[in-house]
Amino acid sequence: MKSLIMKTLYILGALYASVASGQQNTVLPEYPNSYEIVRDVVEMPVGRQMGSGNAIDIDSRGNVWVFERCGGNNGACPESDVDPVLQFSPEGKLLSSFGSGMFVWPHGIVVDEDDNLWIIDAGVIEGEKGNQIFKFSQEGNLLLELGEPGVRGDGPGQFNEPSDLAIGPDGTLYILDGHINPDSNRRIVHMTAEGDFIESWGSKGYGPLQFEGPHAIAVDSSGRMYIGDRTNNRLQVLSSTGELLAIWTHWGRPSGIRIVGDTLYAVDSESRAAVGEYGYNPGWHRGIYVGHLDGTITDFIPDPSPSGATSFPEGIGVSDEGVIWGASVGDREVLKFVRR
């Protein structure tokens, strides 16, 4: 049975490779859309612009935490004195902020069950800062620091452009280490809650248990991992011990993933049909997928500007009530999606 499963997975990998080389994928079915988009949902201080961002999450009180790129995008934070970590009330009022001068390229934020904040800095200033993960209290007190500041590496305590993080049901950390740059890592790093290395899985490539542009990770209540293997236009599902369980291409090109209860949310912020264009994924459309942990999709929220630049959220957070919050890179705004 195991050999049959692996054979099937390798066939899927080969099918993906043919798609990546330019063949047409399956056309996206017409899923229902039960959500409406709400814009202008957060208030920024006078003179302070929202930066690009894919890092957003919700705490136990419904407050929205955004880790944005200091009013700009690439290179903005090292030249800025603004706070990139922003806390908003459910109504969008700015409650607090911190983090000025601490980060290179904000790329992820996760709120744990104790309402502490896990911050992912995917950029690097060689020998100085970046390539790290931090745990903060909501008051901005540093509780834990992972990785070596300003160092690229693939050792047990090192990272190279970490993209995202998820917390397992046992409190251990699953860190998605790597991004789209050719020399960055392509792996999942499993650590204790205190940051001690346990093991890692994955490598660079297009086959099963390989990643090319890993960008998002979530873990369900059973410890299964859901990895947005974005550049490979797929979502890979792994067991808590790193065994490959499934490869899904029908969830688009995942940039952000969240799980709330038994519901899986994934946002595709990049799919494009133009041959040779970044994000080439013909037959799929940008938007937010909502569905079950078995891979069944129940809803799809389409990008209202599918032919433009990256305009839809790249990262999402979901409240306990199922309200979806999104942070976008291109439009540099926070959006809300509520059920009709």
List PLM regions with ranges.
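Sequence-structural signature of mature extracellular/luminal beta-sheet repeat domains
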Residues: 23-340
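Bacterial N-terminal signal peptides
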Residues: 7-18
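N-terminal secretory signal peptides that target proteins for export/translocation
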Residues: 1-4
